[in-house]
Structure formats: C-alpha cells, structure tokens
Amino acid sequence: WAEQFWGNGFSKEDYDKVRAAIKDPDNRWIKFINRVLDETNPHVAKMAALNLGFEAFFRGTKMIRKNREIYHCNIPWLILFDPTSACNMHCQGCWSGTYGHKANLSFDDMDKIITEGKELGVYLYMMTGGEPLVRKADILRLAEKHNDVELSIYTNSTLIDEDFCKEVVRLGNITFQLSIEGTPETNDARRGDGHYAAVMKAMDLLKKYGIIFGTSICY
C-alpha cells in the first residue's frame, strides 16, 4: 500500500529493501520497531504512528515537495527552534551559553511557527535551548493545540518528573532526547555532580510510563 500511495516518491530499490527488511525476522530495524511497540504506551505509540508515520512522512512530505515547486525554495522536513535560552545548569563548553539566558519565544511565536510550518507540510518539530523544559507548561499547551505534530525535546533531564510524564502520556505526541556523555565520571565532569544519576532517573521514569526517548551525546 505504501508504494501505491507514494508512487515514484522513492525508487524501486528503496521499496525492495523495505520489503526484504519486513520479511527478515532478524533485521535490526524490524527488531527495533518491535521493541518500541512492545515497550511504548499504546496511546504514545498510536500518536507517533499517526504524526510521524502519516502526517510527517507520507502526507507532509508530499505537501513539502508540492510547495517547493510552488514557492521555488527549499522547505525542510523538520523545524528546530529554541523556546528559551534559559537553563537551570551551567555545563562546560555549552555553545548556547554564549548567547545569554534571557531570550525567549512567546507562546504565540511558537504557535505561529508550528501553524505556518504545517501549512507547508512540516509535522516534526525539535526543540533545543537553553533547557526547553524551563517552558514545559507552554510546550504542553503546544502539544495539545497541535496534536497532529510530533515534538522532539532535547533536554538535560533534570525537570522530568512523574506529573510531567503523566501529561506527556495523556497528549502522546512528545518524545525526548536526553543529553549525556559517556561514563558517570566523564558526564559529571562536564555537566556537574549528580547529573548522570538524574539522567538515569529520568530514563527510568520515561520507561515506566512508556514514553519514547533517545540520547544526545557529545564526544
């Protein structure tokens, strides 16, 4: 059905590779997808499939290609923005720290970015900072208002708690990339004592609630 829907959006070789992967029970990507489905909250999994699989990958990409021809310019598949430059940590070598900690996008500004992005076919939004979760209330509002997009948050993990996880599960369209560097000693030398343990605690919480997350590693 994907080939019928997508047509010549991909090459015959691409479709053949996907078919081969689906038929191979030992394919690492199929194993990864199955593990995600097994360990993810059902509502979160459904929203990821709808927002990333259908809205972003299928419908969104077709809109993007059409709008590139209309406007004669490149349109990205995802948009990255910083809700705030504020942060509750002072990590050594942080590039964003050189810009100060007082810059903020208003809720209306962020709402406009997503609203106009969707009109062009963009349904995936990444947030960095600063620490985006300093603005967690506004992020939850955005996720609820735009429940057809996926929000991916790059975070130092320290502001993830039980109440926040419950809201993320209720909404279903927020995923996380947790910043961490190697061993506890290596990580805490750069980010401060106790940060590695805080990331492990956040991972345990996210896994407990079946929320999708990954890691962001500097090396």
Map each language-model feature to its residues.
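A short N-terminal interaction module
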Residues: W1-L37
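N-terminal [4Fe-4S]-dependent radical SAM core
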Residues: N27-L80
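A broad, low-specificity signal for short, low-complexity segments enriched in glycine/proline
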Residues: D38-A45, G53-E55, C87-N88, I113, ...
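Long, contiguous hydrophobic alpha-helical segments, chiefly transmembrane helices and signal peptides
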Residues: A49-G53, I79-T84, G93-W95, L133, ...
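Canonical Radical SAM [4Fe-4S] cluster-binding loop centered on the CxxxCxxC motif
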Residues: H72-N74, L78-D108
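Residues that cap or initiate secondary-structure elements
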Residues: C87-M89, G100, L133, L159, ...
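Radical SAM/AdoMet-radical enzyme domain recognition
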Residues: F107-M127, R135-Y219
